[in-house]
Amino acid sequence: MKKSTKLLAGIVTLASAMTLAACQSTNDNTSVITMKGDTISVSDFYNETKNTEISQRAMLNLVVSRVFEDQYGKKVSKKKTEEAYNKSAEQYGASFSAALAQSGLTTDTYKRQIRSAMLVEYAVKEAAKKELTDADYKKAYESYTPEMTTQVITLDNEETAKAILGEVKAEGADFAAIAKEKTTAADKKVDYKFDSGDTKLPADVIKAASGLKEGDISEVVSVLDPATYQNKFYIVKVTKKAEKASDWKKYKKRLKEIVLAEKTQNIDFQNKVIAKALDKANVKIKDQAFANILAQYANTDKKASKANTSKSDQKTSSDSSKDSQSSKSKSEK
């Protein structure tokens, strides 16, 4: 049931955003609560809660959601939103409804949260495509390992994993047979094919496999399962490894996918794209209680400006130094 407590990071803020939106669309004097001798109005509730951290984040989410729906809404179909929702529901299985309820969400509010995330993801990916250079491809190629055929044992206990490692490394051991017998993977799957940029297994497992030669067996790889907050332990054997071509262009399509994935996951790059969208939308904050909710995006522009200014100052300083040296040389002559 631990899985149900981690539906998505920050998911509650969207539900709060909907509450704030409802408050703002209702008459300020509308009573929310009545009691003997007093009432609590929408305005009372709004003023009491707007300065809290969760309300600040909720308003930010609401602004970003509205801006990206306006600018990119036609780029992500409702069908794709439904597919993403269904996939999430499938992953949580029977605990999905409980997870939604515990997070204060309904089916509709969760779908809106998913859609907002998909719109931002689309915008970030499109921006990343425009910045792709040969240097990006070459850098990705340096750390790229082509397709590997592997056998993977998944275990829940470190002591057991270490014991099984001894078994599979023993002379004459049948790794595949031991893997099929011992793995605790839900689907009992042990055979995998992937390259170094794949995500079908944890990154540390793929990294360990990438560093192995054909026929080698890894040490025990410990990975924290984000769904259960429990460690899982992996043992990998590489049974076949494709030889890496000397020309990066052979992998251009795959390298593009890897570079774009890295860029879209980069927080600074995400903030840069969001900042540009907010600027285009001409967002104006009317209530000073929310004056700083966009600060992280304003800082993105300032950092870029500062970096450009620094480069400009360095160039000016360098040019001045050259001029000074030139003048000195002429004077000496």
UniProtKB/Swiss-Prot annotation:
Keyword Membrane applies: yes
Its EC top class is isomerase
Entry EC number(s): 5.2.1.8
Q: Which domain of life is it from?
A: Bacteria
Supply the alphabetized keyword list: Cell membrane, Isomerase, Lipoprotein, Membrane, Palmitate, Rotamase, Signal
Q: Where is the PpiC domain?
A: 145-240
Catalytic reaction equation(s): [protein]-peptidylproline (omega=180) = [protein]-peptidylproline (omega=0)
What GO annotations for molecular function exist for this entry?
A: peptidyl-prolyl cis-trans isomerase activity
User: Mostly located where?
Assistant: membrane
Name the residue ranges with Basic and acidic residues bias.
312-322
Residues annotated as signal peptide: 1-22
Task: Please give, as recorded in its UniProt entry, the membrane topology of this protein.
Answer: Lipid-anchor
State the lipidation positions (N-palmitoyl cysteine): 23
- Biological role: Plays a major role in protein secretion by helping the post-translocational extracellular folding of several secreted proteins.
Name of the featured protein: Foldase protein PrsA
**Gene Ontology biological process:** protein folding
